[in-house]
Regions:
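N-terminal basic, Ser/Thr-rich segments that initiate or prime the first beta/alpha elements at protein or domain
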Residues: 1-496
Length: 496
């Protein structure tokens, strides 16, 4: 591909349509303010359509790409020509996507991620689908060759793409977990809030409930049916959204890379080098935990700050499935689930007290406000009931947060778990830790606790170990990265 290549001619259909979509507000304005309202001609309307169509055609005619001397080049533009270059040894990801229109025309888009930010990625929009796959394989093969080839100019040609083996294929039945995700719960709560607006004001006063009978109870029953219908609708929408986003999800692995394919209306294929996977994140929001499910994300290093450093490998699925895939990601040539199943080291009574206090304090403040409103004649029976329910809920939340808190150094991995409503377990390879940060607030210092942060180049850029005793945190850091701490003159403290 040393010569400049043009995109597929079928993009002459896609590009003008895309430009028309971008110019839609202008087109509507021209239609409303044009000759139709004055009984004139169609000149302005035709011009408003012709301009974006011409821009789309010009975009296609002036776009070229090539692969030459270890780099990918993309050239486009007529009046203002731009040339974008990506070195093959800096390619981090190769994504192949195809919208519904692209799939109808047999086209695909190749997006080459370089780690310099989403705006610096190279996007080849309009390749034939087989050509896009060939380019993806060629790029990944050349990337591996550039990374491992000797320095001399007579290096061997890039090896053929290795055989891939399947790791996971989506079971459509897993869509039953979609309503239990955070998005599903929020949607249900929103629909419940909207439905509650239909209640008359008297329904919120316990002393007026007898006045609603008997006709009022029929109204309440109607509202209850509406709330139930809204809940069912939100569950159905969550299931449909799950299937559209993750349809035919397939995760495969070769000796050097992982490949993830998913999507119904828009298919997306993401390829990531194995060396870029720094760890995993097992997300266990409360709803999924109660349903015996979880979600798995992979921590990917080398992505730009504007990109998402956590790639979803497994959408909400049975916990056993999530643990199996996570073990395959962490275990390299042999699956391992020790960082996922081993008991975690607790953080002691001081950390437990902080978890309980942080959960209970807002509830106590709310109850205090409700109590103070008694004298001001602002208290309603429903607000009193709410205040009484908040206290036990806060106590349960604090206990669950305390049980969830823990850490572990297992088989060269840093393991940290925290949270309750959105609990997650983060597993990070020690070789991907590039630094440590110790933070403590005034309240933490009084309890002898710190927040230990492992800095990394992937995901959220850090893995936090919350409210860990200072001695335990330093021992954990020294156990995972002894050389890193030795560089700053730190030695493992004696046991206490």
């Amino acid at each position: 591909m040393s010569d400049w290549q043009r995109l597929d001619p079928r993009m002459l259909v896609v590009e003008p349509v895309s430009e028309l979509r971008r110019f839609l507000p202008v087109l509507l304005g021209a239609l409303l303010a044009g000759g139709f309202a004055r009984g004139g001609g169609l000149g302005w309307e035709l011009l408003a359509v012709a301009v974006p169509v011409a821009i789309g055609v010009a975009r296609y005619l002036t776009t070229r790409y090539r692969i030459l001397d270890g780099r990918v080049e993309l050239r486009r533009g007529l009046l203002q020509r731009t040339l974008r270059t990506a070195q093959l040894d800096r390619v981090r990801t190769v994504d192949v996507t195809a919208s519904l229109v692209h799939r109808v025309l047999g086209l695909a888009t190749v997006r080459i991620g370089t780690g310099a930010g989403a705006e610096q990625d190279l996007e080849l929009d309009g390749l034939r689908a087989p050509q896009a796959q060939e380019l993806r394989e060629a790029l990944l093969a050349r990337v591996a060759h550039e990374a491992h080839a000797p320095d001399d100019a007579d290096a061997a040609a890039p090896p053929a793409a290795p055989t891939e083996r399947p790791v996971l294929r989506l079971d459509p039945g897993w869509a039953r977990y979609a309503p239990f995700t955070s998005a599903g719960v929020v949607a249900a709560a929103a629909l419940l809030g909207v439905a509650s607006q239909a209640l008359p004001d008297s329904a919120w006063r316990l002393d007026r409930l007898p006045d609603l009978a008997p006709a009022g109870w029929g109204w309440l029953l109607l509202v209850a049916v509406g709330v139930l219908a809204a809940a069912v609708s939100s569950a159905v929408l969550a299931v449909l959204g799950y299937l559209v986003a993750h349809w035919d999800l397939t995760l495969t692995r070769s000796p050097t890379q992982w490949r993830l394919t998913r999507g119904l209306l828009t298919t997306r294929e993401t390829s990531v080098e194995d060396a870029r996977l720094a760890g995993v994140v097992v997300r266990e929001p409360l709803g999924l935990r109660l349903a015996g499910a979880a979600e798995l994300g992979a921590v990917v290093t080398g992505l730009g700050q504007g990109e998402k450093g956590t790639l979803t490998l497994v959408p909400p699925a049975p916990r056993a499935v999530v643990d199996g895939v996570a073990g395959a990601v962490l275990g390299d040539d042999r699956p391992t689930d020790a960082p996922l199943t081993a008991p975690l080291r607790t953080h002691g009574p001081a950390a437990v007290r902080r978890r309980r206090l942080r959960a209970l304090a807002p509830a106590v403040v709310l109850v205090a406000l409700v109590t103070a409103s008694v004298g001001a004649d602002l208290l309603t029976p429903w607000s009193l009931v709410l205040a009484l329910l908040v206290l036990p809920a806060a106590i349960a939340l604090g206990e669950d947060r305390a049980r969830s808190l823990g850490h572990l150094a297992s088989e060269g991995f840093l393991v940290s778990r925290s949270g309750s409503l959105a609990r997650h377990r983060e597993v990070l390879g020690a070789e991907h830790v590039i630094g440590w940060t110790v933070r403590d607030t005034w309240f933490q210092r009084r309890s002898g606790l710190v927040t230990l942060e492992a800095t990394t180049a992937g995901g959220s850029q850090r893995v936090q170990v919350l409210d860990v005793p200072e001695h335990d945190g330093l021992v954990l850091a020294a156990a995972l990265t002894p050389d890193l701490l030795a560089e700053v003159g730190y030695r493992t403290p004696p046991s206490q």
